[in-house]
Amino acid sequence: MSINWVTYKEGSESDILLLENECMFDCFDGVAISILCKPPSLKSWTCTKGLLCLTNQRLVYIAKDTDCDFKDFQSPVANLKDTKLNQPFFGANYYSGTVMPVPNGGIPCEAEVKLQFNEGGIFNFVEAWNRLIQRFQEVDSVSRVQHLDPLPPYHRPSSSQDQPPHYEEAVNKS
């Protein structure tokens, strides 16, 4: 079963097919994932080992453990909210956040997602994630720029009294 299905390159079950204008940032092996839907739906999915790939458009998880509840999962970057790095006193560091559902996806409502980096690499992931989020924010802020009022139309002065000093000299030189 796939959650928000992932398309693979032909003949491979770990090499994801990138979307148009999508590029791979980094991949992290040995990552555990748990997805817990918020009430009213109490669906949940877990996997203890898999490959996590971060692209410029989405987060993709491919399960490598045969005992997992699902085969793969993906979420658009914009659908992951309230993300944070967690460093428990005991256990591996993990990254958590809220994933918003996509139309016709496998997640029925908002869900808590937890990515546990059992084989290291979380700080590289956090650095790549923060760069990606910063780019999203820059693009968003550019699209919301307040434009100034248009400049008034230019009208040629009607008399020499309305012209700035030395205007005639400058016009005659050119």
From Swiss-Prot:
- State the UniProt keywords alphabetically: Cytoplasm, Nucleus
List the subcellular locations: Cytoplasm; Nucleus
Compositionally biased intervals (Basic and acidic residues): 165-174
Gene Ontology CC annotation, any one: cytosol
Report whether Lipid biosynthesis shows up as a keyword of the record: no
Disordered: region residues: 147-174
Q: Which GO terms describe its molecular function?
A: chromatin DNA binding; transcription coactivator activity
Q: Which GO terms describe its biological process?
A: positive regulation of DNA-templated transcription; positive regulation of transcription by RNA polymerase II
Q: Which PANTHER family would you find in this protein's record?
A: WW DOMAIN BINDING PROTEIN 2, ISOFORM E
Q: What is this protein called?
A: UPF0664 stress-induced protein C29B12.11c
Please name the taxonomic classification of the source: Eukaryota, Fungi, Dikarya, Ascomycota, Taphrinomycotina
